[in-house]
């Protein structure tokens, strides 16, 4: 953040990144591994499979974008069966802590500034993926300082207690 703030002010003495970050997008988050992915990208792959206790086919490219906070992801999901997009969106609307911002006619879609200070996850740009059968695309945004591992752990713990899953 210090480098970004200094670049806004025209200073360039503090360089956390090898390149200017102001008005830039850097596809390099964490160290590169032998497989060409970064540690952060592999963390996304491994944590997703760990959470779902499966071997979901997943890939990721992590990009550093100069915003003061927030994580954004473009997600492509392939389902086993055909689906009705409106039914899927209705189902997503029922998830606690998930807010749909998906009205492209009025230019409403998730952006990092919506998420600032919120525990909600914002989802939009929900559409069928024409490149792959039974697939959809969506854009997801959350405040990484609020909706990270700690908040998720608290929410999961509350759910476990509420459903009497532990003594």
Task: Please place each PLM-identified region on the residue numbering.
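Active-site-lining helix/loop region of Rossmann-like oxidoreductase modules
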Residues: 1-91
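C-terminal active-site/capping subdomain that shapes the small-molecule cofactor and substrate pocket
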Residues: 56-167
């Amino acid at each position: 953040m210090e480098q970004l703030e200094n670049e806004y002010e025209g200073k360039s003495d503090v360089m956390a990144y090898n390149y200017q970050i102001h008005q830039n997008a850097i596809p390099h988050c964490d160290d590169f591994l032998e497989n060409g992915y970064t540690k952060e990208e592999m963390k996304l792959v491994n944590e997703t499979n760990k959470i779902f206790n499966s071997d979901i086919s997943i890939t990721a490219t992590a990009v550093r974008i100069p915003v003061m906070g927030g994580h954004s992801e473009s997600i492509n999901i392939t389902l086993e069966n055909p689906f009705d997009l409106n039914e899927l969106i209705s189902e997503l609307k029922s998830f606690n802590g998930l807010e749909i911002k998906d009205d492209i006619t009025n230019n409403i879609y998730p952006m990092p500034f919506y998420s600032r200070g919120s525990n909600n996850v914002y989802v939009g740009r929900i559409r069928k993926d024409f490149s792959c059968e039974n697939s959809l695309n969506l854009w997801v945004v959350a405040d990484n300082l609020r909706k990270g591992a700690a908040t998720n752990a608290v929410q999961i713990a509350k759910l476990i207690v509420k459903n009497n899953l532990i003594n």
